[in-house]
Amino acid sequence: MKLIPLVPVLCLLPAILVAETRVNTSAGAMLVTEMAAGLEEPWAIGFLPDGDVLITERAGRLLLISQGQRREITGLPDVYAEGQGGLLDIMVPRDFAASNELWFTYAEPGLLGGATAVGKALLSPDRTELTNFQTLIVSDKTRSGNHFGSRLVEAADGSVFVTIGDRGTGPDGLEAQDPARIEGKVLHLTRDGNPATALPGYFPGVYSIGHRNPQGLTVDADGALWLVEHGAQGGDELNLVQAGRNYGWPVISYGEKYGGGQIGTGTAQPGMEQPLHYWVPSIAPSGLMIYSGKAVPLWQGDVYRQSEQRFHRAAGPRSGLRRRTHHKCANRPGARCD
C-alpha cells in the first residue's frame, strides 16, 4: 500500500515528531517521518522553497534543518524568554526566493518586562546569519510574562496579519478594548512594515480588537482570515476576523475567571462578535491551518487546529466546520496552557 507523507499536515505542531510512524486515517495510510530531534521548546516552523526548514526555539535560537543536518542561524536580537515569551513565530514570504526576507515575532526585553515585537530580516545566501534586522512594531512593555499572541500570516496581496495578545492584564484590564492600543489586537501591515489598514479612531494598522491571546491564524482560499485564541478558564474561540470588528474580550466571554466568577457582562453584548465556535473546558488552541495541499484531495479546505494535547481536523468552511476527527499528540504535564 502506498503511504502518503503526513509532514504537511503536522507542520503546526509545537514539537517535532521524532519517530517514523505509520498512521491510518480516513484518507488511507500515511507516514509520519522524523524531521529533527532534541529540540528545546520549538515554537514555529517555516519552510523554504527548496525544502529546507527553519525552526524557532523559545529561548532565542533559530535553527536550519537542511539535508538532515541542523545548524544555528545567528543575527537575532535578544529576546525576553520569560513566562510565555521568547522567540516565537516565523513567516517565510512567498517571494523568499527573490527577496531572502523572513518575518519574526518575539518578546523584546526591557526594564519593565517584555513586549510583543514584530521584525524582519534578510537571510544570508549561505543561510548562516540574518542581516538588516528591523524591528517594525513593539507593544507596551509589562511585567506580565503572559499573552504575547504572536502569530504571523501572509495575505494573498503580500500584506501581513499578526496577532498581539492582551499581555495578561486579566479580565479587569481593558487594553484589548482600546482601539488606540495594539495589545489584544490583530494588526495588518504592508511588507514595508507600514499600516495596511487605517480605521478611523484606531491605532494605525489595527484590524480588529477584543482578543485575549490569539495564537492560531490562517487565510483560506477565498482570502478570509481565521483565528483561534485562548480563553481564560474555558471560552477558547474560533473566529472569522473582519476589519473593524470587536471580538469581545474581556467584556464578553464563554469562559470564567480562574477559580470561578463571571468575566465582564456575560456572553453577549451589542456591537461585539460571537465566535464561530467556543470550547468549554479549554483546549488551549495554539495553531491553525486550512489544508490546501495536493497529497490528500479528500482533505482539501479542511481546518486543522493544534492544541497542547490534540491535533484536530474539522470539515472546512463550506461544510459548516463540523468536527471530523482528532489525533492525540504530545502533552506537557502540569503546564498551564493559556
PLM features per residue range, with description:
Residues 5-15:
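Bacterial N-terminal signal peptides
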Residues 19-170, 216, 223-231, 281-322:
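Acidic, Gly/Ser/Thr-rich repeat motifs that build Ca2+-stabilized beta-propeller blades
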Residues 19-31, 125-130, 192-200, 254-271, ...:
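Blade/loop signatures of beta-propeller domains
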Residues 32, 69-72, 132-134, 195, ...:
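Predominantly a core beta-strand signature of beta-propeller blades
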Residues 108, 162-183, 235-241:
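Short, conserved, GDST-rich strand-edge loop motifs in beta-rich repeat architectures
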Residues 121-128, 187-196, 241-248, 315-323:
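Short loop/turn segments immediately following beta-strands, especially the blade-tip
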Residues 205-237, 242:
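Repeat-solenoid scaffold signature
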Residues 211, 322-338:
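Conserved blade-ending motifs and adjacent loop-strand segments that build the rim/top face
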